Amino acid sequence: MSYSYAEKKRIRKEFGVLPHILDVPYLLSIQTESYKKFLTVDAAKGRLHSGLEIVLKQSFPVESKNGQYELHYVDYQIGEPTFDETECQVRGATYDAPLNVKLRLVVYNKDALPNEKIVEDIREEYVYMGDIPLMTTNGTFIINGTERVVVSQLHRSPGVFFSKDDSEEGAFSARIIPYRGSWLDFEFDSKGIIWARIDRKRKFCATVILKALGYTQEQILENFSESKTITFNSKGFALRLDNLSNMKGELLKFDIVDAQDNVIVKKNKKLTSRDVKKIKDAGVDSVAIDFDLVSTLRVAKDIVNEATGEVIAYANDDVTESLLESCVEVGMLELEVIDFITTERGRYISDTLKYDLTRNTDEALVEIYKVLRPGDPPAAASVKALFEGLFFIESRYSLSDIGRMKLNARLGSDKVSKDIYTLENSDIVGVIEELINIRDGKGKVDDIDHLGNRRVRSVGEMVENQFRIGLYRVEKGIRESMSLVHKDKLMPKDIVNSKPITAAIKEFFTSGALSQFMDQDNPLSEVTHKRRISALGPGGLSRDRAGFEVRDVHATHYGRLCPIETPEGPNIGLINSLASYARVNDYGFLEAPYRKVVDGKVTDEIEYLSAIDEDNYVIAQASTKLDENNHFVEDIIQCRSGGEAIFTESSRVQYMDVSAKQMVSAAAALIPFLEHDDANRVLMGANMQRQAVPTLKSEKPLVGTGMEKIVARDSGNCIIARNVGEVAEVDSNRIVIKVDTEKSQTSNLVDIYSLTKFKRSNKNTCINQRPIVNVGDKVEAGDILADGFATDFGELSLGHNLMVAFMPWNGYNFEDSILLSERIVKDDKYTSIHIEEFTCVARDTKLGPEEITADIPNVSESSLAKLDESGIVHIGANVEAGDILVAKITPKAEQQLTPEERLLRAIFNEKASNVVDSSLRMPSGTSGTVISVQVFENDKGGKSKRALKIEKELIDKARKDFDEEFAVIESVVKSSIEQEVVGAKIQKAKGLKKGAILTKEFLATLPLSKWLEISFEDEKLEEKVQNAREYYEEAKIAIDAKFEAKKKSITQSNELSPGVLKTVKVFVAIKKRIQPGDKMAGRHGNKGVVSRVLPVEDMPYMEDGTPVDVCLNPLGIPSRMNIGQILEAHLGLASYGLGKKIEKTLEKTRKAAELRKTLEEVYNSVGDKKVNLEALNDEEILTLCDNLKGGVPIATPVFDGAKEEDIKSLLKIGGFATNGQMKLFDGRTGKPFDRHVTVGYMYMLKLDHLVDDKMHARSTGSYSLVTQQPLGGKAQFGGQRFGEMEVWALQAYGAAYTLREMLTVKSDDIAGRSKMYKNIVDGKLTMNVDVPESFNVLRNEVRALGIDMDFDYSSEEE
């Protein structure tokens, strides 16, 4: 096994028995692939049947009303974005690119005859159709400067669905759901009548739809019912027994007798195959029936007197005596009737026709029109147009390829081509037939929660739909413009207005329910957000109406949606996460991978199955035992089939799971020993990992699952090498790789990677990248070059490994509280940097422009000390609450001054009185360091000094960066040819003769540009130098062009909102240490609040004097059933012990041979998966050992983790007791505790619920407008609510004065509180109470009812 650059530095020991069959696919592919499919930029490769291309093709051509103009679509191009991703975030712009569509305007001769079209002119040009947001490399969008994610939606797939309602009768219904257009429902009522509804409007008979389609009453009966022939004569009535085989399984309503009157089959018996044979053998072809039975029948076809053409009876008329007499009169002695005798099947449609009052197609169309447009008078043309537009015109109704596939599959017919996306007559007939079959018990209703009936709508499809909406509006505009514009040389540009497209797309990205502000607490929360599947949103469910069934875990979720990871609140089960190996197929259905089993042998061939396909197969679990030839060891094995868990013979198995972790999501797959935890706690664990705050120093988990590196790699937060090469330069801002062009498929000699430094994330955490490579290191493509935030050597690192003791300590871990050691605070283990952004906007007001200036009236010099001359705070200044960040003055209305004041103003030249200080100040409860300032101005007033200074710094930095980049390219070009040219014969060189030998000394005097002008006699060498010269010149031109582009984007004017003159953004870094009140958690749902930080000397300690870091309450485990944390602690202790063992060996010797022996014991003595130490050279072994001192990292994959024996063996090697317990001593007394305590290493996270963000106190502040009571909440600087129950408490204690204070001066007694404030200032401690404002509100509300309520001011004596 080969190891990557980062893995060699710290190899993770892997447990687990199952072989590695398939790599976890790229985690963000659901986003990137979907949007790529939408844009399909590369037209050369052929654009697919989706995305922009198909929408444009469907919308064009557009024809003018008079037929003179036609606008055709030809092609489209997507331009280059104005700013790059970083620039967009800084400027608050949207990362998008212009869409230019090539349109062809065909002009026809208006004088031509009506039926002929003569082309007069064709005009073609590219038309701007708005800006399309582009996706970043990490699957996000930058909209107005913020990163957003479009969450995929799980919605009901288009197609037909049959269901049964929950009422006692259990009425059956069918619903045809298109991708776009009207819904069509058919439903049975309790009487067996079939009703239809369009778009859930008023119901009407289902046969009305059939008549509207052009079917006659006779044809409808023929389609849906069998007919039988009855003969009659003077002896009575007889029923012909033809198609006997169709009667199998039906209940007989009469005896069947032979010619000798022997009963062959008795009445009320179900007919079997044997009975049919008996009847045939007896030669019985008809059976006598009585008139009572005949009178229940109905006529199957119209009965016409052939002689006169008179209609005796219509199809579906009842068979009556008078009808039979009429038949006899005209000599008809046999009658074709609907078969109600041998089957009930035909009765449903027959009964429905009885209710249906329409007689023909026209009447049926009018009936449908009345239902859809009640109150509108039906006109013949509009009636037909409405009905056809509902289901038969592709621009208004589309099943889409998915709907057509599902409809054909459900009805089991391929009569309709899969390219027809509208409804056909056979579809509607087929749906009604299937509904009747289901009612008769011959079919099954659909399970709406089955993932075969729900599909994923990803970002590309949603943007495509928005684009279609915008384009539809543009199309209407084009038609209007064509008829209004009268220009001789009309061009496509003149008639296309692209604003509706831009508006539709902008609305979707800014205010759509599924376009969300990216969760960016840490890399895992980013990845999980992009892999989220929501059932909410437009076209989906609403959380109020979603029942238990929709939210529940379904058998088809296996390997597709994670059964664990979902929110805990009202959205539980409606928001899911994609399972680790799942993917979305072309139809939008979720697929899971399986290994194919052929003749009892499990192959390595992988097949992806959708939920529909999977129902038909028997699938074995990943953990099923196989022999060395990949055959099943056991004869009877546990499998899944049709949604059930079964035990079956191994010979029946057709597929096998790929991996044990394929059932869970990426977040759940990060939890070691997941299989030993209760599911409710795992849900919390998976959700809380997403809330972990990245700390100052990242530390890998000692006990992981092997999924850490995959999440870190795919999150896009690490820098990954693009090509093979050698590290040429490293500093904190960039890494330069000299590319090995022979091994890499690229002509670039140099790869330069810029690192992100101290960037603010969406959650105000700090994004910072650190290089992990050194100059001279050899790297392969795909190796990690730099760690991002919350990663350590390319592994996800959300928290820290702490030594945990499960023991109570003086009540400080009551109810899940956590007791922490002071060492953790001193070592800055959980110290995190948070970057807050403060914005100050100077606007143009009615009274004049606001101004950002350091000259502010009535503000002390000390308050302005941290500002520069422009009135903006310096970078590096330490700011406290209340400090001015940006000094700003706002003009206020002129005041009328007295003559004395005017005189004084004139004497002292005071003019600042007509402005008010509206500076941006640091909010209460925060302090930090200013790390960055950005100034945006419009061009009107010229740029301020600070803006010019920032601009100059950015341009100088860019120039320095590009110069350094060019210097690297120069050195690489030099080193690539230097060895070969030294000692070569010269053809031509300035300062040397022809044929002279080139020396190193001569080269040292020349710059590289002069080197490359020398020509050589050796042709091969000359060619190599020529190539180097071309590369050098191209690189120089490219770098100059890049610099100019960067300079242009830096100096480019800013588009500020209307009325805004200047915007200043100040970024302040705030350092937060862990403290009591902060929330912490493990990975098993074990969460708690820090109750106390205890001095190290008071913490319990081991026999060797090592104090523990954390004390956790052991009572938090039994009731919660998350035993995984105990196993993690044991394995963590073993890992720590192994690290100590390596450290001791290092102290004795640094010889690689000795170290290899220790490493061999540590890595390869326990567990099935061995580490190939031979692949590492001696230097790498030494580096590895140095990195393992703190503990040997271990991977225990979910459902395939370390066993109890493995943990015991490792504990033994690490030098600990195999039960993981030890004697601890009290740090305060030095005495041992009464019994041994479980001690181990657990990975703990600090969550984004920090006490600093929640702690809040109010003195005086803002009040509510109506009630005049203080506002609530920290954001409003509000007060604490003294509610109803608290009032009762004070009443119960008789605390009258306290109660009066609470309900008046501290709340809404306006006069009383201002008097109180004055009294406190004056040093008087008295309280004057007035009427609370809420009483006035009540009084006014009562007055609004017409009752005058007021105080009775008269004295008692009166």
Swiss-Prot record:
EC number(s) from the headed UniProt entry = 2.7.7.6
Question: Record's Gene Ontology CC terms?
Answer: DNA-directed RNA polymerase complex
- Please list the GO terms describing molecular function: DNA binding; DNA-directed RNA polymerase activity; ribonucleoside binding
**The protein's enzyme class:** transferase
Functional summary from the UniProt entry: DNA-dependent RNA polymerase catalyzes the transcription of DNA into RNA using the four ribonucleoside triphosphates as substrates.
* Keyword annotations: DNA-directed RNA polymerase, Nucleotidyltransferase, Transcription, Transferase
Q: Which family does it belong to?
A: Belongs to the RNA polymerase beta chain family.
InterPro entries the UniProt entry points to = DNA-dir_RNA_pol_bsu_ext_1_sf (IPR042107), DNA-dir_RNA_pol_bsu_external_1 (IPR019462), DNA-dir_RNA_pol_su2 (IPR015712), DNA-dir_RNAP_su2_dom (IPR007120), DNA-dir_RNAP_su2_hyb_sf (IPR037033), RNA_pol_bsu_bac (IPR010243), RNA_pol_bsu_CS (IPR007121), RNA_pol_bsu_protrusion (IPR007644)
**Subunit organization:** The RNAP catalytic core consists of 2 alpha, 1 beta, 1 beta' and 1 omega subunit. When a sigma factor is associated with the core the holoenzyme is formed, which can initiate transcription.
- State the name under which the record lists this protein: DNA-directed RNA polymerase subunit beta
Q: Which reaction does it catalyse?
A: RNA(n) + a ribonucleoside 5'-triphosphate = RNA(n+1) + diphosphate
Please name the source species. Francisella tularensis subsp. holarctica (strain FTNF002-00 / FTA)
> Which GO terms fall under biological process for this protein?
DNA-templated transcription
